[in-house]
Regions:
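Short, surface-exposed coil-to-beta transition loops
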Residues: 23, 106-108, 160-163
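Active-site-adjacent helix-turn-beta-strand microarchitecture at beta-sheet edges
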Residues: 80-149, 154
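Short acidic-glycine loop/turn motifs at beta-strand connectors
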Residues: 31-33, 78, 113-118, 146-148, ...
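Zymogen propeptides
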Residues: 16-103, 177
Length: 234
């Protein structure tokens, strides 16, 4: 494992690559109690950022630094979110409980959210019963893990491999994971369960999966992106 060497955030933002057998993963842990975790979609002109680097440049104009960023859920051709999107407490896209084709609609899908209690991942169907004030939320799918159980739709023998990224929550902290090698859904979920001790984990996307982290020397650009999640420092 290698630790993030970005003082003064080294004690708060931990990143590592698994150094054992393939496949490899990079893990970034964010503590919302000490770090500013935000969702981003459009710039000041209402245009989608599309690239992690463009978001970093826009923040820099206001003397703010993008410490970490990752694609944060699935999106339409116009880059708008497929499902729930809440930024700064304001819902810009509603919860999507429809049936359809594609990974987003594989059951169950879920929501990553941030409340005063910290980060959480829940199944989408559970959201209407949640009464906590939500500061940010992004809906995606499918759930990789629910209550410690790998999604039963995943085939351990599948040959469908892609770069993938996802998120879980451990003790109120957000744990973001991106694979450095193409992996199956099952292998990805198993890593989050066994190596990271996640109980509920959400798939964010595959193939387009991208990471921004100056401390790790990362500025990925695999595709144009919709929702982006990141840590911002002044």
């Amino acid at each position: 494992m290698r630790a993030l060497a970005a003082a003064p955030l080294c004690a708060l933002l931990a990143a590592c690559a698994s150094g054992a057998a393939e496949p490899r993963f990079t893990v970034v842990t964010v503590d919302p109690a000490h770090q500013r975790l935000q969702l981003f979609l459009n710039d000041e002109q209402g245009r989608p950022y599309r690239r992690l680097e463009k978001l970093a440049q826009a923040l820099a104009k206001h003397d703010r630094k993008l410490v970490f960023a990752m694609n944060a859920g699935m999106y339409h051709a116009d880059f708008s979110p497929v499902g729930l999107y809440i930024a700064d407490g304001v819902a810009l896209s509603p919860l999507n409980l429809a049936h359809g084709k594609g990974n987003f609609f594989l059951r169950p899908n879920g929501v990553f959210l941030l409340t005063d209690a910290g980060a959480r991942v829940i199944e989408s169907s559970e959201l209407p019963a949640l009464h906590d004030k939500i500061h940010l939320a992004t809906q995606s799918g499918p759930m990789l893990l629910s209550h410690g159980v790998i999604n039963p739709v995943f085939d351990p023998g599948s040959r469908s491999v892609h770069l993938r990224n996802g998120v879980c929550a451990v003790d109120g902290k957000a744990v973001f994971v991106i694979s450095e090698d193409p992996v199956t859904f099952h292998a990805f979920a198993r890593y989050l369960r066994d190596a990271l001790k996640c109980r509920d984990a959400l798939y964010l996307d595959g193939s387009v999966s991208s990471l921004y982290s100056p401390a790790l020397g990362r500025n990925d650009h695999r595709a144009e992106l919709g929702p982006i999640i990141g840590v911002v420092a002044d």
